[in-house]
Amino acid sequence: MSLMKGKKGLIMGVANERSIEWGISQKLADAGAELAFTYLGDALKKRVIPLAEKLNSNITFSCDVEKKEEIIKLFEDIKSQWGEIDFVVHAVAFSDKSELSGEYLNTTRENFLRSMLISCFSFTEVAREASKVMKSGGSMLTLTYESTKAIPNYNVMGGCKSALEASVKYLARDLGAKGVRVNASSAPASASF
């Protein structure tokens, strides 16, 4: 299948072979896409580089989405590597694990703000920078999860994903006028590719 032949895109947030974003990466590669990947820190670098190589990619970038300058540099590096890209898959999320269980009332200000920055606002900054190097007709995808119900052991992430879904609507409005699609995919935890 060559539906994506000649298309180039960035995958952000692959954690391991069991992650949804890894399944997405495999499907894109199988369809002919050329992929680049991001990682954060040495532990993820050791996992992401071998995974990228399995899909014939040697293009990996370090990117801490908590740092605006790293997002800017990421897309400058992509421009240097490829010129333009066709798509971005944003699968970046974070919360302090100790605050996912128990009562939402116990969410700390620090974890709320950090979780919202990484899990939600980073997509806005990624979209802003990606749009500078994205071809008309390009696509941006972020991953979300059931945000209409209070899910046990999800706490602050529920709020982050609700905010992310709202952000997608506004980004779709802004970037749609420039020929770029923006969507969120809400896959169940048991999704398989």
Short names for language-model regions:
Residues 66-81:
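Conserved Rossmann-fold cofactor-binding substructure of NAD(P)-dependent oxidoreductases
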Residues 33-47:
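Conserved glycine-rich Rossmann-like NAD(P)H-binding loop of the short-chain dehydrogenase/reductase
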Residues 29-31, 41, 58-60:
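Glycine-rich phosphate-binding loops of nucleotide-dependent enzymes
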Residues 8, 34, 84, 139, ...:
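Structural signature of beta-strand start/N-cap positions in the alpha/beta core
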Residues 2-37:
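Canonical Rossmann dinucleotide-binding motif of NAD(H)/NADP(H)-dependent dehydrogenases/reductases
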Residues 8-10, 88-93:
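Conserved hydrophobic beta-strands of the Rossmann-like cofactor-binding core
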Residues 52-69:
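Rossmann-fold cofactor-recognition segment
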Residues 13-20, 93-128, 132, 136-178, ...:
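Catalytic loop of short-chain dehydrogenase/reductase
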